[in-house]
Amino acid sequence: MNHLPEDMENALTGSQSSHASLRNIHSINPTQLMARIESYEGREKKGISDVRRTFCLFVTFDLLFVTLLWIIELNVNGGIENTLEKEVMQYDYYSSYFDIFLLAVFRFKVLILAYAVCRLRHWWAIALTTAVTSAFLLAKVILSKLFSQGAFGYVLPIISFILAWIETWFLDFKVLPQEAEEENRLLIVQDASERAALIPGGLSDGQFYSPPESEAGSEEAEEKQDSEKPLLEL
């Protein structure tokens, strides 16, 4: 009879430990998971990631910077109107800078269309623009007479070449890997939320019932009453 309270204590301890284990299982908060999923989905609905927007801004900067240098070159070589007519209307591959400006326009249109409008997740568009830019500039530097026209004969081809390769590096090493990493994180969070949904809901303290402890003498009294019942019936 003296071992009964110890058994009751062991039972209570077991129930408390099971309760603690259930709480540990529900340490994953589905609300937090859903909040993270909504944040990732909000980025998708936003249409364009922050790093891709930065890339598009740099492409725009490429066009504006080359345009600015070309306008400066037009103004330096005898006025904008006269030089513009000479380079555009009387275009000469060997001495004109107009084709370098058109090359910047070509990069801008292709890259913005591919990575801002179509939201392409492949490198083929940037590979096309960089290859065309590199081949054209190398041919122009070798065949043309730009170096005899002052500093702009060096500046415009070099700047265009560098900007094209910076765009390639930025897309290939920043934009595409970061977006792929964010997509993998979204898949992991969604998978964790699905697993958390399969776990049964946590049990509250009120759902655990612990029977009241009985005194040692109460069972002895019950046994005496059971033994006296046949005598009373006789």
Curated annotation (Swiss-Prot):
As for membrane topology, the entry says: Multi-pass membrane protein
Positions carrying Phosphoserine:
15, 21, 27, 193
Motif FFAT is found at 208-213
Residue list for modification N-acetylmethionine:
1
MENTAL domain location, by residue? Answer: 48-218
Q: Which residues lie on this side of the membrane: Cytoplasmic?
A: 1-53, 119-122, 172-234
The region called Disordered is annotated at 200-234
The Basic and acidic residues compositionally biased stretches are: 224-234
Which keywords does this chain's UniProt record carry?
Acetylation, Endosome, Membrane, Phosphoprotein, Transmembrane, Transmembrane helix
Q: PROSITE patterns in the record, alphabetically?
A: MENTAL (PS51439)
Q: Could you name the domain of life of the organism this protein comes from? A: Eukaryota
Query: From the UniProt record, which GO molecular function terms apply?
Result: cholesterol binding; protein homodimerization activity
User: What are the transmembrane regions?
Assistant: 54-74, 98-118, 123-143, 151-171
Question: Which Gene Ontology cellular component annotation is one that this UniProt entry carries?
Answer: endoplasmic reticulum-endosome membrane contact site
Q: Where in the cell is it found?
A: Late endosome membrane
Q: Which residues lie on this side of the membrane: Extracellular?
A: 75-97, 144-150
One GO biological-process annotation of the entry reads: cholesterol transport
Tell me, in a sentence or two, what this protein's role is: Tethering protein that creates contact site between the endoplasmic reticulum and late endosomes: localizes to late endosome membranes and contacts the endoplasmic reticulum via interaction with VAPA and VAPB.
Relate the assembly described in the record: Homodimer. Interacts (via the MENTAL domain) with STARD3NL. Interacts (via FFAT motif) with VAPA. Interacts (via FFAT motif) with VAPB. Interacts (via FFAT motif) with MOSPD2 (via MSP domain).
Similarity annotation: Belongs to the STARD3 family.
Q: What is known of its domains?
A: The FFAT motif mediates interaction with VAPA, VAPB and MOSPD2.
* Protein name in the entry: STARD3 N-terminal-like protein
> To which species is this protein native?
Homo sapiens
